[in-house]
Amino acid sequence: MASILVGSILGTVKDQLVQSFSAHSPRGRRGWRWAIWITLVSVLVLLVVSEVVIRRAGPILKGRVIETLSSRFDSKVELDDLQVSILRGLQVSGKGLRIFPPDDVVAAGAKNPLIAVQDFNFHAGLIGLFLKPMHVGVVHVQGLAINIPPRQMRGQGAKKSRHEGKIKILVDEIVCNDSRLVIDTANPDKDPKIFELEHIVLHDVGPNAPWPYDAKLTNAVPKGEIHAAGTFGPWNTESPGDSTVTGHYTFDHADLNPIKGIGGILSSVGDFKGQLDRIEVQGTAEVPKFTLDTANYPMPLYTKFSAVVDGTSGDTYLQPVEAKLGQSQFTCSGAVVNVKGQGHTVDLDIDVPAGRIQDFLQLAVKTEPVVMTGVLEMKTKLHIPPGKQSVSQKLGMKGNFTLKQIHFTNPELEDKVDMLSLRAQGKPKEAKPGAEDVHSRMTGRFQMGEGKLDLQDLNYAMPGATVRLAGVYTLDGKKFDFTGKVRTEAKLSQMVASRWKSWALKVADPFFHKNGAGAEIPVKVTGTNGSPKFGLDIGRRDSKQ
């Protein structure tokens, strides 16, 4: 191409000079003859130099790129192709750039390149080719992949003194599209931690200083856009996972609905710092209309959290999270654990010091209105295993609770509880529908899973009586099935208003008067939330007799 260009230019120059030469006198022609030859020789020299520059620029720059990167990362560097053009300054494009881990890390088993680039290009002034170091304004990168080997591999080789070679190229800014950061793990039960970076810009890229960056990525689950800005580096050559990273992030409009069993739009902001292997995060998150599919009742959920992301395992440790559901505040701590090929397991310890039971029932139980209101104290362990099932079906909880100031929203059930309290105190004449609500307290152990709530050692105390129950309550509100005993202060004969019924029951008093109680009566609660049935469980008592 250069030869054709040289021939064309020389031919054109010659034709123009010959025309001018023919128009002058013989004496003038001798002067023009010399001018023609001097011009032709000058043009020829210029074009020969240009052709040499074009031919040599590629190898020169390829050598500089490899030498600069090899010096910076202290490792082997490969570059498949480098193309150079000088028609509009110095334009460079390359393909297949690979930077490998240090030799001792490769010997320990690291096989993938530490850094791989599909394509890159940059533009610089032509004079820069002859300067050392060469200055480049912006480098555009497509398909950047960074693979951080497991910490165990990075620790195999002894640390050695680095030879700081001369940097042959200085870059102001690197613009990367479609990048991926992979932090590998040596644990066979874990998947590597992967960050997909849609767009990232690195500023002031120097060898021994942090690089300011601005990044944008689309989170897969829940799907939403994350924007982060901060600093990265300096790059730790011996152990890349220990390279420092800091920043501030925003996570907007993350749709929870594709996650089976839950719904809502998540937003989060926060700050992070640490190393690639271990990043500390502090932030807030909110879902104004959070739902579980067992109820589909939207509840506002807000959290303030502190977490550690372990890049070596892919696990996230929460320590702790301050949360608010509706008007109920609680804390939780625990871990989101990476399970190879399956997803994550969530294990949390939850502490509700003084919440509202109605907030939790509205979220989880498909009944309107909720069964009861009251003040909830609860300590529980929450477990969500990986899998494709609905979160509500996978969700498991186990713990204990205390309920105070209980009020049943079903008027019929509340009346029965209030009248039971009055009869148990020996005030049967006051036991009428619409009686004043009694102050009651409930404690117990529970286990929730597979869409049902299993209650054990349920102790319901009210003036004049204590109710001890155990049984199952389905979260869809379609089934109550509890059995137990009511222990009262009054005897059976003292619980009825009719005098003749009272005399008749005196015969039965000795059979129910036991263990220090006026009466101990077997009871059952069955039915549904809309139609509960509260009555004696005489058959069960008879079978035990």
Give the label of every model feature segment.
Residues 439-443:
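Generic long, charged, amphipathic alpha-helical segments
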Residues 96-99, 213-220, 319-325, 456-462, ...:
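Short beta-strand segments that buttress and anchor functional surface loops
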Residues 2-74:
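N-terminal type II signal-anchor transmembrane helix
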Residues 212-215, 251-255, 289-290, 315-322, ...:
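Transmembrane beta-strand segments that form the barrel wall of outer-membrane beta-barrel proteins
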Residues 68-72, 129-134, 141-142, 146-149, ...:
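Membrane-proximal interfacial segments on either side of biological membranes
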Residues 446-454, 458-470:
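Extended serine/threonine-enriched, polar tracts that run as long, contiguous segments within proteins
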Residues 75, 82, 90, 95, ...:
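Residue-level detector of beta-strand structural context in well-folded domains
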